[in-house]
Every structure is written in structure tokens, then in C-alpha cells.
Amino acid sequence: MWILFSPSEKKCLEHKKAYQAKEETFYRDFICNIGLDEALKAYIGILQGGKESEIKQMFGVKNIDLEELAAAQNLMQSPLLPAVLRYIGVAFSALDFEHLESYARDYLNEHLLIFSNLFGLLRAEDKIPYYDLKQGEGFERGLVEFNTRKFYAKNTKNIWEYLIKQQKESLEILDLRAGFYQKCFDLSKIPITLKINELLVYEPNFIKNGKVVSHYAKHYRGILLRMCAKEELKCLQDLSSLYMEGLELESMQTIQDKKIKRIVLTYAIKSK
């Protein structure tokens, strides 16, 4: 069983658990390794020698923080931190990984996969340096043209092989990703060369006053992930009985499409 999660724009610059890499190829064992080396070198090259306007566009900012820029410029030598701690946006604040019991942290290290827009698919405990790249923003240097969606396309086979390597018959996935990352890696497009008897995908929606919420959904995805970890959820069917403060499961809709069974869970946000 896997839980798929989005990264966050906001990242931790300094952390007491960060440590210096012993070698530059910290990404050697990453799942998405096709084209990663040249992409990172191009990324660093632009930050070190590119125009200020180009860097602002890559970062998605009006003003560049020099400390953050310096860390990203020296990405290969910057201190490393587990991905689940590097990201500190709304969803990760709700998850509050550091204050979970050790068993819950172990659960996430085993089941959580984070879709980075630069490094590709990351395990929760994969160590990454500080970096910045606005969602959906690409870059080009020399012969290298980086685009997040194209990068995932190159690594699709690697990702599927990783997802199914520990599965026996069916594959269960809780998809907590934002729409952009769902498009980067489409669960409905299973390569015909891979043997999967059934793919079971659970996908939550959050509504308030009858309307689907978008921004607040980040927070509640983090809450849902936290509760899965605290309860050590082994089977996604158990989501139907999982209690979450502030949320009420309103409906579960099943959509069958060939080998894919998609279960859409609609949670109502209760007024305080």
C-alpha cells in the first residue's frame, strides 16, 4: 500500500537534523534517475550564472532571498534532510511529522511517497538539500530543457516498477496529490508490460457548505495522512471507519474502469 503526496513550495532552510553529504551524488539511489544528473547540473548552472529575472521566474518570487539562493546554488554540497522534513508547507504542518510517535514515523517512512517537482518521486526518508522551483516552472540551459511533467514521463517505467515490486496481486494507493502532480504521473495509464491484477485507488475530496474546497484541502490532506500514520492503516478499506476531528465521511463512490477501481471519498468539513 502506498500513500502519494504533493511537495510544498515552502521548504526548511536549516534544521538540527540536517547533515553534510559525504559525496555529491546524494541522488544516486533516487527512483527517478533518468535525466536527473543533467537536470541538476543545469539548475545549478542557471542559479550560479543566470540572469536575476530568470532566477526570480524559476523561484516564483519578486525578491530573491540571498541565503536561500546561496543554498540552492550549492545544492550538491548543501546539508541534506529527509524529504518529509524538508517540506514545511500547509499539508506538512498539519502532518507534523516530528511530533508523531516513532511507530507512526516508521509507518510513513514505509508507505509515503512525495512527488517533487525537481527530484521526481521521493521516499519520505530520501535525503534532499534545500532547493527552490515554482510548481510547473521549467528551465533551459545548453542542451538541457527541464520540464517537470516531461521528467516524470521519462521515469514512468521506473516509478511503476517501484510501486509494484512489493505487491503480490492487487496494488492499493491513497492518492493525496494535488491535480498538477496527478497529471505528472497518471495512475490510469498503466504500462501494458506490467503485471497488475487490480489497481485500487482511494482519492479524497473535501467539501464545506456543499462546495469542494481547494486551498484548505492541503490542510485536510495532511490531517488525513497523520491519522493514517497514527492508526497504522494497513488496508484502505478501513478509511471508512477512520475518525478525524473536524471531518465527517459523507460518501464513498466506486468507479470501475478495467483494471482500475477508483473510490472517491467525500469528507464534509464540520463547522466549529
Sequence positions of predicted segments:
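Internal, well-folded beta-alpha domain core
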Residues: 97-272
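Extreme N-terminal starter segment of soluble prokaryotic enzymes
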Residues: 1-3
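Active-site helix-to-loop segments that bind/position phosphate- or nucleotide-bearing substrates
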Residues: 5-99
